[in-house]
């Protein structure tokens, strides 16, 4: 799935787990069981104005199909609606196939398709890279994903419509290893419940209240958080799932909070550790790689004023424990980014109690401590962050405070991949759901109107393209930015300004008072605000998915935009551009499909390295070592012209990875400005209260070992748009690329 906003929104929606009912009627895959004009057993989620109903007139089979249509009066940006059904069982097998018939009418600004998700983060496909557009007759489509029944909690199927138009779905089928799901040959997988799975004692709350926030108490809670996290990822008995480690914290906390002094505190910790079980001696269990890029941070054991016995207990576990599998962790096959398992999200806890808020902080801090490949790149020493945030989390008074606390600590990770992607309901309300009808961005360090989402609102809004906004509701824009900085997690300044620029013109009110400069005249005007669904909003750049991604510019220069590139266009690009003077690849966007190797093969004559990665360790958490990166192979028909790549702050993650690949081409030039500085496959994190975030799960480096995280892809020629260029409608970055090719 390529659309990051769609990834985030899909990850927000949770579904009930496996049930005991397996009858075909309950599955209702043919949509024939209907109540109140809607298929029984299905859920709906998404954003935007859509209607989903049973349709008895247009159908492929039986008496009913399902119709999804965009009912908005205006074209809607970044909206979708999905039909969802959770399969009642977990199944033995190697792969699952979802098939279904789809018919479409005037699908634009998006696509229609099936979708299949295996939770938690085991597999996902929503046909984004091969979605159905336009008007099409009934045709069967399918999705296939590998199964992992041992770790599966839910399997969810469905269909979705992104953007505008109509789609009909009918006659879904699910197969396990080519056998229909209702076949007698299908075997249900019954997962063996471990003690950690069976422990439900604190499902309704921790019953923990923490009132003493003296410096001594905070120091003790910091120590507990570090010991708790160390044991979670190092002790074999915890790793086996023999303990619900969340709830063991709640069992231990009451006596720990009552410890009268450090001696009593340390005795409690030693006894806690000893009661987990014995660990046999191992002479070669913990050998830190000599070439490790990052080594485990264990200095806290020596620097925390611990008793000798407690130090020995921790050091013994570190030296002798061998953990090859962990109930709470695995590394993704083929990619090796961490996958955090069995982390209960406690979605029913709107405002978690003291114990659960402390747990949330401990969980997140330790994940970063042991499995963030970029922990050395934070502005703050991560070792001191835990202590700083203990009073912040425990002093929160409501859900909004809790969300804001997490946004702040996520921000300290300095990763544009990281944000409060799920569960930020009160934060969303605080920022408001009303938006200006125009877009403003930071150009030449000024907040400049760059585009109207809906030109029909220009007359009432008054501001023109190129106008400079200086004040919002009487406050300097610069003052507002400084006050918001801690609530926008990003890797660097470029991505921060990109993200905050949209929300500056967002409010709970129906209008905003603006002071601005227009042709050197200072003006004031109150602009109306609109609901997102009433505007053609977009993030960073516009996409016309129906247009070709490539063209030949004046002067015989090839141009390719990766925003809407399709796999089947790549051979055409190679053939059509073979005699051009140069090629410009525009990655000031997010690639619609993955092109580094298929398109990159056009520009090299031999296997070419362009990247290498660092990976974490299961047996030595906190250690990160280099692994070899892939090579771009030649297709034997190298392009002979010049190659220029365009980047800016909208170039993030896969965009940056792609830019790195093309940068490896001899004499290629990168033109533009600082990219978002967040690359590598993401790892998702569940947090109490229904919150969710992510991190960049692997370290991404150039072959010579230079960092890309936070730094981004550094242009060979630095150029940004100017206010005059914005006013005149010029793409100055593109013009510079043309100049470079012509010279």
Show where each model-derived region lies.
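Bacterial Sec-dependent N-terminal signal peptides
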Residues: 1-23
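Extracellular and organelle-lumenal recognition/adhesion modules and their flexible linkers in secreted
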Residues: 20-194
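PDZ/PDZ-like peptide-tail recognition elements
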Residues: 194-201, 403-459, 544-551
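Cationic-aromatic interfacial patches
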Residues: 203-205, 220-342
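Cleft-lining beta-strand/loop regions that shape enzyme active-site pockets
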Residues: 208, 216, 232, 257, ...
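PDZ/PDZ-like domain segments forming the peptide/carboxylate-binding groove
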Residues: 217, 222-225, 229, 298-331, ...
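Conserved PDZ fold ligand-binding element
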Residues: 227, 231-235, 364, 460-493, ...
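Amphipathic alpha-helical substructures
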Residues: 237-270, 372-417
């Amino acid at each position: 799935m390529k659309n990051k906003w769609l990834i985030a929104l899909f990850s927000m929606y949770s579904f009930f787990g496996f049930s005991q009912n397996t009858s075909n009627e309950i599955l209702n895959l043919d949509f024939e069981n209907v109540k109140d004009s809607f298929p029984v057993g299905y859920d709906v989620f998404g954003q935007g104005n859509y209607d989903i109903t049973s349709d008895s007139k247009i159908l492929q089979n039986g008496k009913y199909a399902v119709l999804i249509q965009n009912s908005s009066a205006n074209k809607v940006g970044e909206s979708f609606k999905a039909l969802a059904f959770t399969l009642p069982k977990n199944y033995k097998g190697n792969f699952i196939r979802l098939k279904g018939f789809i018919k479409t009418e005037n699908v634009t600004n998006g696509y229609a398709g099936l979708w299949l998700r295996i939770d938690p983060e085991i597999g996902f496909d929503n046909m984004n890279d091969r979605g159905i557009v336009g008007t099409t007759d009934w045709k069967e489509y399918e999705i296939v994903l590998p199964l992992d029944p041992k770790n599966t909690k839910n399997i969810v199927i469905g269909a979705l419509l992104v953007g505008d138009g109509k789609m009909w779905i009918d006659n879904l089928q699910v197969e396990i290893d080519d056998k229909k799901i209702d076949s007698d040959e299908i075997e249900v997988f019954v997962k063996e419940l471990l003690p950690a799975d069976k422990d439900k004692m604190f499902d309704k709350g921790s019953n923990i209240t923490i009132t003493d926030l003296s410096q001594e108490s905070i120091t003790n809670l910091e120590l507990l958080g570090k010991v708790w996290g160390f044991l979670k990822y190092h002790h074999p008995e915890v790793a086996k799932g023999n303990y619900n480690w969340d709830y063991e914290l709640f069992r231990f906390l009451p006596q720990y909070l009552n410890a009268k002094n450090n001696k009593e505190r340390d005795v409690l910790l030693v006894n806690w550790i000893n009661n987990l079980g014995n660990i046999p001696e191992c002479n070669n269990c913990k050998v830190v790689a000599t070439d490790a890029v990052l080594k485990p941070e264990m200095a806290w054991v020596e620097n925390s004023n611990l008793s000798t016995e407690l130090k020995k207990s921790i050091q013994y576990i570190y030296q002798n424990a061998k953990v090859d599998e962990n109930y709470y962790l695995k590394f993704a096959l083929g990619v090796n980014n961490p996958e955090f398992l069995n982390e209960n999200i406690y979605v029913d806890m709107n405002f978690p109690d003291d114990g659960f808020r402390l747990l949330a902080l401990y969980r997140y801090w330790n994940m970063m401590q042991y499995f963030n490949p970029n922990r050395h790149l934070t502005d703050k020493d991560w070792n001191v962050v835990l202590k700083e945030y203990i009073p912040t989390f425990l002093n929160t008074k409501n859900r909004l405070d809790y969300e804001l606390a997490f946004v702040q600590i996520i921000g300290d990770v300095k990763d544009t991949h990281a944000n409060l992607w799920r569960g930020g309901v009160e934060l969303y309300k605080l920022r408001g759901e009303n938006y200006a009808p125009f877009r403003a961005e930071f150009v030449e360090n000024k907040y400049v109107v760059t585009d109207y989402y809906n030109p029909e609102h220009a007359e009432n809004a008054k501001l023109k393209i190129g106008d400079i906004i200086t004040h919002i509701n009487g406050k300097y824009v610069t003052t507002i930015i400084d006050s918001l900085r801690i609530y926008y997690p990003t890797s660097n300044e470029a991505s921060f300004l990109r993200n905050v620029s949209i929300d500056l013109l967002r409010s709970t009110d129906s209008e905003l008072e603006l002071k601005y400069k227009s042709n050197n005249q200072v003006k004031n005007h109150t602009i109306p605000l609109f609901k997102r669904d009433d505007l053609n909003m977009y993030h960073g750049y516009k996409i016309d998915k129906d247009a070709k991604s490539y063209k030949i510019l004046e002067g015989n220069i090839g141009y390719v935009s990766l925003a809407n590139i399709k796999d089947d266009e790549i051979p055409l690009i190679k053939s059509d551009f073979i005699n051009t003077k140069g090629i410009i690849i525009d990655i000031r966007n997010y690639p619609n499909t993955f092109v580094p190797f298929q398109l990159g093969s056009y520009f090299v004559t031999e296997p070419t390295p362009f990247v290498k990665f660092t990976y974490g360790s299961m047996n030595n958490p906190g250690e990160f070592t280099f692994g070899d990166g892939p090579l771009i192979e030649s297709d034997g028909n190298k392009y002979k012209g010049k190659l220029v790549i365009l980047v800016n702050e909208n170039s993030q993650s896969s965009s940056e990875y792609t830019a790195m690949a093309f940068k490896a081409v001899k004499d290629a030039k990168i033109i533009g400005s600082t990219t978002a500085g967040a690359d590598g496959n993401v790892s998702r994190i569940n947090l109490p209260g229904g919150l969710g975030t992510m991190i960049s799960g692997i370290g991404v480096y150039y072959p010579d070992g230079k960092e890309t995280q936070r730094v981004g892809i550094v242009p060979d020629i630095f150029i940004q748009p100017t206010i005059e260029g914005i006013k005149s409608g010029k793409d100055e970055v593109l013009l510079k690329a043309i100049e470079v090719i012509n010279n």
